[in-house]
Amino acid sequence: MQHHIIKSLAVLALGAMLLTGCGSSKSLEKQLAKMPQKAMLLSEVTERGLTLDTLETVYPSGMSQWSADSVPQEYMLSWQKFIYGLRNALVAEGMNWTEPYSLWGRAYFAPDGTVDHYFYTWRGKSQPSEEWKAQFREVLERFLATYRFEYPMNRRFAQCGGVSLRPAQ
């Protein structure tokens, strides 16, 4: 009788996994692998039928393993280095801007800390020109190709945040 109950529970657990989408991450991974580049606007991602919620099944939040007040300082410093690294890459590539620009982005990291994807959207009243946005995307692609998140996670994860690009003084 006990063996029969355990077997029934195993079948129920498998059914629950299938219903919650645990079995669908492989098809999502294939869809992500077909993305034309690492950096894409959020609108382009949603046009492909993806949402941040579905992406979270493959790339859970990097901070989800900690409570809000116990996130390691080294993790937060690694994220700040990502943001500052992006700004420094723009400056190093000779990009100039005279108005402050703001964007929100979500980075998707591989277990070794390399960037699999970065999806973003421009925010605020001040918007860059289409030419500037195209150049930004090129620089962003080069930056993402070589960047490695310093805090060791050893699993896929996502981190999001705003990026403020203030003009150089």
Feature names for model-found ranges:
Residues 23-169:
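Charge-biased low-complexity segments
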Residues 19-21:
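C-terminal motif of bacterial Sec signal peptides marking the signal peptidase cleavage site
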Residues 1-10:
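Bacterial N-terminal signal peptides that target proteins for export
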